[in-house]
Amino acid sequence: MREFGLITRRLVTALLVGLGLMASTTIAAAEAIKVAAIYTLPVEQQWISRIHKALNTAAERGAIEYVYSENVANTDYERVMREYAEQGKQLIVGEVFALERAARKVAKDYPNTAFLMGSSFGPVGPNFSVFDNWIHEPSYLSGMVAGSATKSNVIGMVGGYAIPEVNRLLHAFMDGARAVNPDVKFIVNFIDSWYDPPKAKESAFAMMDAGADIMYAERFGVSDAAVERGVKAIGNVIDTSGDYPDTILASAIWHMEATIDKAIKNVSGGSFEAADYGQYSFMAYGGGSLVLDEKLVPADVVKAVRDKEAEIMDGLFRVNVNDQRPVSDN
């Protein structure tokens, strides 16, 4: 349900499934920790949606009591953090890429509150932990699919911002494509927005006009352009193949559950401390995966991709991490 006050938020109450005994319900509720999340975008946005999904899953099993605020302006973010801390939330989750210094200042003022924030920088003791969607591994695999599928040998890539968290995914995708197709060329553009589907769509059309027949959809809007032009696309973070049938060849999926569950366990056990939770987005921890449409991807390509996936999972192949801004090929 939605609460109204200084902050507009929704409260997700844990759904306690059991025998229906009052005693059992009371015990489960007492064990649930109080968690708040702060989002600068709507929970429907792809990156935010994965965090929201993981927290909802934890709430549904009775592990947490979950409230959240969405569409919080950067200028208001610090105030919202402080309000949740004052309310006694035990764990506060969010993303502070645009306000790193302010967020760390709040954490310092509330040393008994656990903070887990999407961040470009490192953790700060005793209570400020960081995470990111390290899905470079499935991004590499999706690149293999794209490199095998292109006929024009031109792939278009539309990103949000050229920050390390985005750059590394694009580079991994490019490396995967080049591994199976050394002749492939890339057209790269950043729209300087996390959510502007019309702008992303316009950028995608320009790339198609320049010869791209496969589109890497790091942002919403690109797949819509692909559908209109009848070209194929690669998804990112979430699986949108149901929304774009016969268009999405493969997608690199981010699963935030491993990260959230680790943080909840640490808070519940009194062992939460400043740490980098990034590794829990790796495939080995279940934080990343590849989905592909076997109706659209040839069997030999599927096998090659799955074989490489097994190598990654077994520690026999390591995807390179490159945080530098990717550029178009000449």
Annotate the PLM regions.
Residues K108-N133, V237-T247:
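Flexible loop/hinge segments that line or gate small-molecule binding clefts
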Residues A36-A37, K89-V96, L116-G118, A210-F220, ...:
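Periplasmic-binding protein-like
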Residues P123-V145, M157-A162, P245-A258:
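Short beta-strand elements at the ligand-binding edges of bilobed clamshell
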Residues S268-N330:
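Hinge/cleft segment of the Venus flytrap/periplasmic-binding protein
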Residues L55, L141-V184, V188, D276-P298:
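An alpha-beta-alpha
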Residues G62-N71, N181-W194:
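Short beta-strand elements in bilobed, periplasmic/extracellular small-molecule ligand-binding domains
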Residues T13-S24:
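Bacterial N-terminal signal peptides
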Residues K34-R61, V67-Y77, F97, A162-R168:
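Extracytoplasmic "Venus flytrap"
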